[in-house]
């Protein structure tokens, strides 16, 4: 059985069935023992199935030969097999009825007596027969082993023996016995399969380790039932009978007669339990060997066929082969057995006769005792059986893998091997693996490794599962609630924050509460930074935690409960939003904290929406969601909750806009304070800049970017506003950059971009509507740009008006280039203005700019006022504020306000679009760059581009220019002046673009401010205003016009920046805008005709008039050659606002006045609010100077206002924007004629127009030329306006207002200028684009359609001097006539009633725009919710 065990082992693993079994039989006595054991139980089987007498005889004969083999297998083989096959047999015995162990023990105890004798006696004969039978039985056993393996395999190793084979140990003697017993049982029981006999036979195969074993096994397979009888008969010998009795115990299921007989024959040795087991195996083997061999011989010889039939029933063909082999191979078997013993014994068992079991070695007990190899039961014994078969077993040494493969395949191959010569199987397995032990060891090792790997894999899986669970629980570093939400699977925010790829979990539960909490946790710094917000985030965290539960509970909850739960969540979320907003407003949160907090809130809101949608889906599973929030139904039937969620989303958007504005404002170098205040100021309404700036001009700017700044912030706020516009745009961009992780942020950014694009398109559309005017303005702007380029070196700094036309030109060009450059390139007057501005610049521009935003330029003007004669710092601050305000009020009011809004949307990108319009040449407005500047629509693209890029305030069509001029003017001055110097020749559009890009909000604001000034100057004088429009359009781009007059810049800066910015908040709606634009275009066309006439005729006069400094600088840059003198005067008049001396002398004289004028034209510097008041006051001095310079007392007064502070154009009428409440200054008819009168009136300011386009509007600074010239439109004399020119240009509207209002009210000079101006320009230049901020005391709420409209067409309304608030003009006188109104803005004379109508139309337009915006937001929210839904669904599926 040792061999059979081995073979069985091999067969089990599938190593080599026939040959391997054979080898095993040869290798060890264990095979013999196995044979005896398997014979005993096989005989039992055989006896049932086959004629036991024959089998016994064969076995006896074989056993007679066995003795030699007996010793060989007995000593070590038995032990070996006992150990290995003992394990296998033990396993098999276990697999079998543990009877085999019992029988093995008893047989062992009992076997020693007779078993050993029989062993000796049987082994000796079996030595002889063994050799023969070993060959035969080896072959037959190998074949039978194959067959048995096949049968066992065929049975699927169902039988214990199969198990034994599988274990490879059970196939040891005990394995064979047990298998024999059980196989007999199984063969009897399992025989249901065709292989059941084969199985018995395979169990016989186990015994086939020994030839007789194989025969017995075969017989047993068939003759299980008869075998006991046959064995009893054949084994009458005590051993057999004894064997039968013990084997009965051992066999258990097998008839015990066979075991007793076998035991009688193989019982002799009784040994220790192991020995007993071995003994039992041997006994079994003995019994097999003695009796089964006899039987084998008998059957093989006597009844070869009966044997096969007995053996296999269905496998009879296989049996017959083994039988003939056995018959023919008795001796060969002995030889084979000897060879097998020598080979297999030497290698492994090399002791006993491999093929015959020794009675002593029949101790199969170990099979039961050695379960250690249970796992390796694979039919190794069968493989061993094959070994025994392979007398010629040339081993092909193969790698263990190959051997194992063969062993595994051997079970299937065993049958074939049996059919074929056993040599084939032998060659397949190397000798080292021939032995069952080696094969078993190898298989054990492999299996152990496999189990080890399986264990590791299982551990890894468990670890992974645990990690997954743990990760779900601990996804968030913040509170455990996020983890809980993750568990719930609703942690979109948490996963997002933690960058976990668990989208579904977040979607599952995260959003309600944890979403915020993860937000808070994600922005850990934010909660702490925000204070209130931190608690809010904490509350949101609990809310989130609660939401997941709700989500789980929601299904169970009723619709009402769900609705209530969501409503509570929404209320909590709202409280958090409000707390966060308060924190932001309080300025307690850093920008990054704000962004983080907003992201968290956004995530929480998204989660809330998702929860709502989920609830809706649950409530209406079959109904598609009617809305983004889900279909109304039992759950939220009135969709109130949906509306609330939407409102929350809108609040978040506004908050985001405010945050963006706050973030963007810091970008401008000069709007630090504005930014600082801006964060404090929640520009939540920043989207609606018009409403935001509604207070003062600074307010619009501030509101847009930072409502907080006022006076100092007026410039700053003008700066911040444009800056904010830029900031907002940038903020949109930076927001996207800073919070790219927030999909909503991306969507918002896209929305902002789309809005910007939309605004840009609208601007272009409006510009296209006013294409003729735009072309004219472009031409004018080009001329102005040329002038600017020519006179770029001469142009004064950003705020200062060029002392000479050339300087003004340079200034115009430079503003878009760089304030500093312009400053450097400007001539002495420019230097003076620059000095003033510089004096303001380091402290003012830098400090004020940083403090006030772009008020720095104004601040320079502030500092400059003392130096240049501008009012002291109060005017300076206000002057800076006024100057900006003045510009803001004029340009800024409409442009800044409107632009800031749009810039927010398009500051980042649309302003580029604007750029084409930004260039005064490219987009001068309706009638040239001046008109473009004057006209927010026309200007807006160019200014707005600059503004958006610069400050974003100018982003609004006209307000853009103003913010750039006013809001960002200080910055523009600081940074823009260099550009002017550096880029005198740079096209305005380029300059603006450059400003926008290099200076960012600062330069952008500077151009805006320049535009504002220009607008103010243009607005100051209708004719001049038209030029101013050109200039403004030009200037806004270069901001050179504004920057040229540094000294008056403060006065000019205040000009329209604030109001303009305010007005431009929103040109309300397209319809209103279009209507207003059409009206403006019509009037502008009329004005254009007049201006063209004026421009051609009074170019000289215009040059004489500085044509408000702004207009003049822009034009001067555009066309320095057109009227250097005129420019000088225009610029001087604006310079008067900004810098001293229009031509240099007058401008220098005016500079103090001009700066004062700008200071006076507080609107500019004072940010719209201060514009009228303070800038006007400083403007009065400037205006006085200017008027002196201009020498036109009425116009000089107004132009002084204009000239003194173009920003505070005396001719302007101050209107209070109904939307923003900003004061907008329109040139009063009186103011228009004067320097600004020229600006407001193309005829009055033809030179300015030329200066802007062809240096036409030089009259404001121009001494008498502009005054001398009488605008056909305004009927004002051009020469006084020239002096005012700067003032009028600076504050075209202001001047108009100032002239009207302050023609007598401002300083006498200013008043005289204004008077002169106003008489000259048409009744009043209503500069829609430039709505002076509150600074100009607006008598009425005039909203320049242009300033309001962010679109290019800028319309200049000439209202009668009377109608246009003359009071503002009086107040505006301080507004040193801002740069002459940019090229002749297409001035439209509008009565207050017309203005009101326009206001109404614009208001409707704004309302429509707001409605569109809200609708867009709602759509975006719906789309976002749907997207989140889809993502969550996908995530849930994937998760």
Swiss-Prot record:
Native source species: Homo sapiens (Human)
GO cellular component terms, A-Z: centriole; centrosome; cytosol; fibrillar center; intracellular membrane-bounded organelle; membrane; microtubule; nucleoplasm
Name of the featured protein: Microtubule organization protein AKNA
InterPro entries in UniProt: AKNA_Centrosome-Trans_reg, AKNA_dom
Tissues in which the protein is found: Predominantly expressed by lymphoid tissues. Highly expressed in the spleen, lymph nodes and peripheral blood leukocytes, expressed at lower level in the thymus. Mainly expressed by germinal center B-lymphocytes, a stage in which receptor and ligand interactions are crucial for B-lymphocyte maturation. Expressed by B- and T-lymphocytes, Natural killer cells and CD1a(+)CD14(-) but not CD1a(-)CD14(+) dendritic cells. Weakly or not expressed in fetal liver and in adult bone marrow.
Similarity comment: family membership: Belongs to the AKNA family.
Positions of modified residues (Phosphoserine): 52, 316, 499, 534, 767, 770, 848, 886, 997, 1010, 1172-1173, 1228, 1377, 1387, 1424
PEST: annotated span: 771-804, 911-932
Gene field: AKNA
Annotated Polar residues bias: 263-275, 879-891, 929-940, 983-999, 1303-1317
Pro residues compositional bias, start-end: 865-875
Subcellular location: Cytoplasm, Cytoskeleton, Microtubule organizing center, Centrosome, Centriole; Nucleus
Pfam families: AKNA
Molecular functions per Gene Ontology: DNA binding
Described function: Centrosomal protein that plays a key role in cell delamination by regulating microtubule organization. Required for the delamination and retention of neural stem cells from the subventricular zone during neurogenesis. Also regulates the epithelial-to-mesenchymal transition in other epithelial cells. Acts by increasing centrosomal microtubule nucleation and recruiting nucleation factors and minus-end stabilizers, thereby destabilizing microtubules at the adherens junctions and mediating constriction of the apical endfoot.
Known partners and oligomeric status: Interacts with DCTN1. Interacts with MAPRE1/EB1. Interacts with ODF2. Interacts with CAMSAP3.
Composition-biased stretches (Acidic residues): 89-99, 778-792
Keyword terms: Activator, Cytoplasm, Cytoskeleton, DNA-binding, Microtubule, Neurogenesis, Nucleus, Phosphoprotein, Transcription, Transcription regulation
Biased composition range(s): Basic and acidic residues: 1-10, 25-35, 71-83, 276-285, 1135-1147
DNA-binding region in chain numbering: 1115-1123
Region (Disordered): 1-394, 507-562, 659-682, 775-942, 977-1005, 1095-1165, 1180-1211, 1252-1329
Modifications made to the protein after synthesis: Phosphorylated; phosphorylation regulates dissociation from and reassembly at the centrosome.
GO biological process: delamination; epithelial to mesenchymal transition; neuroblast delamination; neuroblast division in subventricular zone; positive regulation of transcription by RNA polymerase II; regulation of inflammatory response
Compositionally biased tracts (Low complexity): 533-544
């Amino acid at each position: 059985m040792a061999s059979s065990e081995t073979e069985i082992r091999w067969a089990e693993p599938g190593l080599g069935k026939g040959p391997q079994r054979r080898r095993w039989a040869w290798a060890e006595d264990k095979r013999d023992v196995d044979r005896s054991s398997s014979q005993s139980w096989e005989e039992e089987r055989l006896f049932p199935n086959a004629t036991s007498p024959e089998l016994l005889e064969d076995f006896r004969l074989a056993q007679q030969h066995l003795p030699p083999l007996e010793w060989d297998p007995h000593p070590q083989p038995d032990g070996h097999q006992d150990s290995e096959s003992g394990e296998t047999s033990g396993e098999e015995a276990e697999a079998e009825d543990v009877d085999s162990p019992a029988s093995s023990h008893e047989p062992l105890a009992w076997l020693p007596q007779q078993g050993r004798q029989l062993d000796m006696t049987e082994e000796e004969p079996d030595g002889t027969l063994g050799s023969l039978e070993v060959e035969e039985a080896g072959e037959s056993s190998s074949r039978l082993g194959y067959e048995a393996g096949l049968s066992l395999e065929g049975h699927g190793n169902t039988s214990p023996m199969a198990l034994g084979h599988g274990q490879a140990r059970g196939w040891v003697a005990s394995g064979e016995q047990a298998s024999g017993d059980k196989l007999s049982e199984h063969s009897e029981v399992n025989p249901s399969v065709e292989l059941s006999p084969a199985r018995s036979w395979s169990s016989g195969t186990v015994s086939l380790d020994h030839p007789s074993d194989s025969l017995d096994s075969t017989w047993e397979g068939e003759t299980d039932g008869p075998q006991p009888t046959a064995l009893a008969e054949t084994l009458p010998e005590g051993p057999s009978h004894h064997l039968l009795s013990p084997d009965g115990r051992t066999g258990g299921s097998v008839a015990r007669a066979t075991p007793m007989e076998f035991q009688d024959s193989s019982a002799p040795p009784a040994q220790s339990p192991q020995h007993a087991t071995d003994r039992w195996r041997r006994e079994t083997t003995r019994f097999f060997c003695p009796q089964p061999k006899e039987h084998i011989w008998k059957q093989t010889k006597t009844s070869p066929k009966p044997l096969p039939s007995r053996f296999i029933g269905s496998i009879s063909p296989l049996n017959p082969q083994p039988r003939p082999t056995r018959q023919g191979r008795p001796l060969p078997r002995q030889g084979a057995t000897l060879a097998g013993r020598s080979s297999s014994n030497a290698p492994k068992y090399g002791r006993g006769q491999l093929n015959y079991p020794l009675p002593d070695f029949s101790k199969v007990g170990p099979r039961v005792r050695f379960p250690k190899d249970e796992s390796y039961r694979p039919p190794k014994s069968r493989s061993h059986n094959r070994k025994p078969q392979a007398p010629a077993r040339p081993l092909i040494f193969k790698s263990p893998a190959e051997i194992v493969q063969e062993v595994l395949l051997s079970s299937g191959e065993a049958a074939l091997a049996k059919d074929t010569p056993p040599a084939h199987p032998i060659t397949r397995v190397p000798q080292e693996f021939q032995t069952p032990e080696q094969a078993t060891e190898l298989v054990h090792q492999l299996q152990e490794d496999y189990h080890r790997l399986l264990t590791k894999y299982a551990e890894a899986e468990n670890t992974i599962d645990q990690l997954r669970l743990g990760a779900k629980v601990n996804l968030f570093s913040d509170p455990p609630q996020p983890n809980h939400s993750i568990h719930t699977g609703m942690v979109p925010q948490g996963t997002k924050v933690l960058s976990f790829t668990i989208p579904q979990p977040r979607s599952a539960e995260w959003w309600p509460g944890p979403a915020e909490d993860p937000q808070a946790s994600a922005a850990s710094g934010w909660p702490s930074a925000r204070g209130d917000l931190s608690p809010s985030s904490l509350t949101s965290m609990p809310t989130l935690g609660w939401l997941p539960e709700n989500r789980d509970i929601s299904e169970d909850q009723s619709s009402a409960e769900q609705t209530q739960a969501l409503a509570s969540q929404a209320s909590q979320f709202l409280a958090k939003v409000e707390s966060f907003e308060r924190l932001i407003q309080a300025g307690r949160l850093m920008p990054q904290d704000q962004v983080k907090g907003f992201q968290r809130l956004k995530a929480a809101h998204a989660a809330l929406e998702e929860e709502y949608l989920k609830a809706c889906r649950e409530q209406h599973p079959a109904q598609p969601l009617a809305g983004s929030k889900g279909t109304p139904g039992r759950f939220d039937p009135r969709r109130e909750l949906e509306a609330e969620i939407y409102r929350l989303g809108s609040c978040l958007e506004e908050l985001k806009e405010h945050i963006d504005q706050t973030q963007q404002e810091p970008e401008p170098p000069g709007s630090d304070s504005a930014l600082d205040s801006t964060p404090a100021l929640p520009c939540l309404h920043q989207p609606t800049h018009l409403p935001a700036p509604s207070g003062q001009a600074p307010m619009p700017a501030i509101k847009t970017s930072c409502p907080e700044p006022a006076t100092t912030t007026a410039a700053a706020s003008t700066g911040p506003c444009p800056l904010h516009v830029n900031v907002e745009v940038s903020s949109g961009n930076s927001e996207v950059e800073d919070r790219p992780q927030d999909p909503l942020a991306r969507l918002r950014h896209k929305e902002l971009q789309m809005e910007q694009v939309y605004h840009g398109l609208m601007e272009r559309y409006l510009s296209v509507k006013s294409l003729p005017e735009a072309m004219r303005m472009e031409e004018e702007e080009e001329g102005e740009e040329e002038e600017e380029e020519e006179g770029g070196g001469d142009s004064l700094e950003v705020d200062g008006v060029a002392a000479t036309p050339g300087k003004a030109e340079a200034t115009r060009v430079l503003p878009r280039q760089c304030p500093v450059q312009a400053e450097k390139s400007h001539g002495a007057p420019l230097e003076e203005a620059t000095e003033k501005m510089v004096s303001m610049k380091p402290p003012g521009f830098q400090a004020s700019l940083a403090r006030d935003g772009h008020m720095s330029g104004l601040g320079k003007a502030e500092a400059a006022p003392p130096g240049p004669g501008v009012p002291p710092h109060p005017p300076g601050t206000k002057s800076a504020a006024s100057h900006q305000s003045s510009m803001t009020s004029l340009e800024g009011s409409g442009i800044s306000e409107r632009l800031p809004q749009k810039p927010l949307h398009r500051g980042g990108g649309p302003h580029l679009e604007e750029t084409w319009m930004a260039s005064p040449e490219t987009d001068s407005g309706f009638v040239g760059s001046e008109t473009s500047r004057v006209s927010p629509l026309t200007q807006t693209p160019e200014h707005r581009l600059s503004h958006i890029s610069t400050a974003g305030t100018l982003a609004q069509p006209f307000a853009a220019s103003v913010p750039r001029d006013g809001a960002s003017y200080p910055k523009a001055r600081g940074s823009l002046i260099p550009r002017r110097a550096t880029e005198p020749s740079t096209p305005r559009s380029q300059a603006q673009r450059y400003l926008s890009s290099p200076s960012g909000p600062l330069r952008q604001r500077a151009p805006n401010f320049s535009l504002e000034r220009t607008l103010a100057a243009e607005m100051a004088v209708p004719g001049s205003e038209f030029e101013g429009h050109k200039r403004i359009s030009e200037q806004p781009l270069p901001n050179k016009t504004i920057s040229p007059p540094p000294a008056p810049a403060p006065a000019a800066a205040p000009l329209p920046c604030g109001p303009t910015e305010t007005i431009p908040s929103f040109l309300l709606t397209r319809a209103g805008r279009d209507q207003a634009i059409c009206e403006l275009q019509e009037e502008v066309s009329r004005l254009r005709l007049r201006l063209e006439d004026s421009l051609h005729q009074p170019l000289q006069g215009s040059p004489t008039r500085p044509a408000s400094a702004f207009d003049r600088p822009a034009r001067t840059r555009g066309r320095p050659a057109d009227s250097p003198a005129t420019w000088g005067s225009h610029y001087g008049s604006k310079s008067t606002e900004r810098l001293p001396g229009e031509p240099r002398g007058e401008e220098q004289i005016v500079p103090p006045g001009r700066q004062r004028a700008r200071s006076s034209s507080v609107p500019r510097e004072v940010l719209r609010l201060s514009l009228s008041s303070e800038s006007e006051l400083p403007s009065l001095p400037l205006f006085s100077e200017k008027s002196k310079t201009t020498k036109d007392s009425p116009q000089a007064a107004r132009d002084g206002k204009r000239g003194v502070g173009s920003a505070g154009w005396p001719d302007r009428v101050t209107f209070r924007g109904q939307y923003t409440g900003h004061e907008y200054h329109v040139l009063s008819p009186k103011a228009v004629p004067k320097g600004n009168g020229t600006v407001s009136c193309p005829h009055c300011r033809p030179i300015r127009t030329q200066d802007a386009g062809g240096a036409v509007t030089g009259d404001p600074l121009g001494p008498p030329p502009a005054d001398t010239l009488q605008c056909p439109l305004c009927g004002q004399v051009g020469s006084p306006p020239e002096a005012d020119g700067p003032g009028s240009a600076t504050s075209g509207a202001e001047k108009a207002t100032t002239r009207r209002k302050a023609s007598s009210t401002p300083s006498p000079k200013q008043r005289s200028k204004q008077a002169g101006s106003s008489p000259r320009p048409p009744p009043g230049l209503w500069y829609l684009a430039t709505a002076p901020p509150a600074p100009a005391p607006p008598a009425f709420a005039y909203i320049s359609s242009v300033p309001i409209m962010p679109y290019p067409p800028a319309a200049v309304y000439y209202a009668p001097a009377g109608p246009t608030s003359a009071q503002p003009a009086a107040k505006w006188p301080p507004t040193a006539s801002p740069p002459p109104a940019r090229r002749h803005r297409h001035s439209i004379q509008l009565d207050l009633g017309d203005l009101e109508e326009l206001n109404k139309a614009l208001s409707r337009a704004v309302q429509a725009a707001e409605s569109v915006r809200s609708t867009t937001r709602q759509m975006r929210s719906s789309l976002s919710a749907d997207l989140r839904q889809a993502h969550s669904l996908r995530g849930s599926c994937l998760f």
